[in-house]
């Protein structure tokens, strides 16, 4: 049996690298903050759409992306090819810049520092890079092009508009959105006497379920847990707790960290308790690592908190072993004899209630140093992505959540959620996005890499080295505050 598990792990490990590199996913200055992304009251720059009409030949647009692979990368390539074939005024070249969003950002920042003529016309970067992008002054807000083209931004999910808005202006032309969810093995739940259709709703319930799974001898360390700032942020934001000042950086430039609160201390203490009781297998957030996925696939663990984009990969991992009906909402106990891994997805287990998340993911940003015709051509591609048929392709084929509201009403999308294993696994994340509170869009932080490093270092100090939670968080908070203040002074 263990040999079979190992073989499956080897088959899926390459595909899982992509999901591991794509955290749900930021650019110094004073360009705050948020709104509903309708542009009302905001002063927008001109979007040079007329330049495309005046161009002597096709605009040549370069798109930089990275951190995606498999069906997600293929979806992007297909959309670009379809766009190029649909008209003769713009030719887009999509260029893969690396295995992670961080690598793309490093190349973008290097080009910006050396010679802006080396920059692409569109760059796909995580939401964590949005503040520094805006403050760097290199991005044409797509809201300006939406206004010039007559596109109604309220067609986009409110929580997405809010999360990717700065100073009441929506910046990306398209957004690939994901959120944190709970993956679990329904077969393990059944063997432990748990209801396979009732995943834990809170972190406390997750602890209780992990004890039941361990005591039943079903899995060695029931929860596979990657140290992740995104998970911790969502735990706090779900309780209305900001990680930085000025309303999480949305009312003004963040200058002070605020996450060392009792709720954060209690959360880390509970995770440490799970370590002490052998209920959790903790992994560092190393770029490209897939070990936390493999713990679920090899059945050393029964549960995993990860980004919803992993749904497609997990569905591929078990393709041929079971059907969507067997792993779906109407779970059949007989499949325990047919498959070792019966994946399910639950809402993100919060501190007090489930599904309390803010959107993560990556936006497609128009670079304003490009010639006007190329900026107009860049918008043409992104407007093409916003068409319901292409937004639907990102969901059905690329594993991202539908951001154009009308997509959810499409019959083939609803069939996907019912009949396709990937769709069954994605549906809880879709529901989370639809229910997400636009007034809790997550933080805007300029030196986001410093914030991530300090917060995750504190988590690792507690979970690996038995550091005292309150002290570790206080030290991290002081360090992040220093980074925020230096950023504000630059």
Q: What kind of region is each of these model predictions?
A:
Residues 21-49:
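Short, low-complexity, disordered segments immediately C-terminal to signal peptides
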Residues 46, 50, 125-179, 235-238, ...:
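Hinge/lid segment of periplasmic solute-binding proteins
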Residues 82, 86-156, 191-193, 294-296, ...:
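Extracytoplasmic "Venus flytrap"/periplasmic binding protein-like
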Residues 113, 118-123, 149-189, 221-222, ...:
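A structural signal for short loop-to-beta-strand junctions that line the ligand-binding cleft
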Residues 166-175, 180, 204-256, 260, ...:
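Extracytoplasmic/periplasmic solute-binding protein
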Residues 192, 277-280, 319-401:
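Extracytoplasmic/periplasmic substrate-recognition and gating elements
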Residues 207-210, 252-285, 348:
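Glycine-centered hinge/linker elements that transmit conformational signals in sensory
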Residues 340-346, 396-450, 454, 461:
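Long, aromatic- and glycine/proline-rich binding clefts that accommodate carbohydrate-like moieties
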């Amino acid at each position: 049996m263990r040999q079979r598990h190992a073989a499956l792990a080897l088959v899926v490990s390459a595909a899982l690298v992509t999901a591991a590199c794509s955290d749900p996913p930021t650019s110094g200055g004073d360009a705050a903050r948020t709104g509903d992304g309708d542009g009302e009251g905001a002063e927008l720059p001109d979007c040079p759409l007329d330049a495309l009409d005046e161009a002597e030949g096709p605009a040549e647009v370069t798109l930089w992306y990275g951190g995606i692979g498999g069906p997600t990368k293929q979806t992007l390539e297909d959309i670009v090819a379809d766009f190029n074939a649909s008209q003769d005024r713009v030719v887009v070249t999509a260029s893969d810049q690396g295995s992670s969003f961080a690598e793309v950002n490093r190349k973008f920042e290097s080009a910006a520092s050396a010679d802006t003529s080396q920059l692409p016309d569109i760059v796909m970067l995580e939401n964590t890079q949005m503040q520094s992008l805006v403050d760097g002054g290199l991005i044409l807000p797509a809201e300006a092009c939406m206004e010039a083209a007559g596109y109604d931004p309220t067609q986009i999910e409110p929580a997405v508009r809010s999360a990717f808005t700065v100073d009441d202006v929506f910046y990306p032309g398209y957004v690939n959105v994901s959120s944190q969810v709970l993956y679990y093995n329904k077969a393990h739940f059944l063997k432990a006497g748990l209801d396979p259709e009732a995943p834990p709703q809170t972190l406390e319930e997750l602890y209780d379920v992990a004890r039941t799974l361990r005591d039943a001898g079903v899995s060695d360390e029931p929860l596979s847990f990657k140290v992740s700032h995104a998970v911790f942020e969502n735990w706090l934001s779900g309780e209305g707790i900001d990680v930085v000042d000025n309303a999480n950086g949305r009312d003004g430039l963040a200058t002070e960290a605020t996450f060392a609160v009792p709720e954060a201390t209690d959360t880390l203490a509970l995770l440490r308790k799970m370590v002490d009781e052998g209920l959790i297998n903790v992994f560092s957030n190393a770029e490209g690592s897939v070990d936390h996925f493999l713990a679920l696939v090899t059945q050393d663990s029964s549960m995993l908190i990860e980004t919803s984009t992993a749904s497609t990969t997990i569905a591929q991992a078990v393709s041929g072993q079971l059907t969507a009906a067997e792993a779906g909402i109407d779970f059949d106990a007989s499949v325990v004899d047919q498959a070792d891994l019966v994946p399910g997805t639950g809402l993100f287990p919060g501190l007090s209630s489930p599904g309390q998340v803010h959107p993560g993911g990556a936006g497609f940003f128009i670079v304003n140093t490009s010639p006007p015709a190329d900026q107009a051509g860049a918008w043409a591609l992104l407007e093409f992505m916003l068409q319901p048929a292409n937004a639907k392709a990102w969901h059905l084929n690329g594993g991202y959540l539908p951001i154009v509201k009308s997509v959810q009403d499409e019959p083939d999308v609803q069939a996907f959620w019912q009949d396709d294993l990937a769709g069954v696994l994605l549906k809880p994340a879709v529901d989370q996005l639809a229910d997400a509170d636009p007034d809790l869009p997550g933080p805007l932080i300029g030196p986001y890499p410093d914030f991530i490093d300090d917060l995750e270092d504190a988590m690792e100090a507690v979970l690996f080295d038995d550091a005292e939670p309150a002290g570790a968080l206080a030290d991290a908070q002081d360090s992040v505050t220093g980074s925020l203040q230096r950023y504000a002074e630059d």
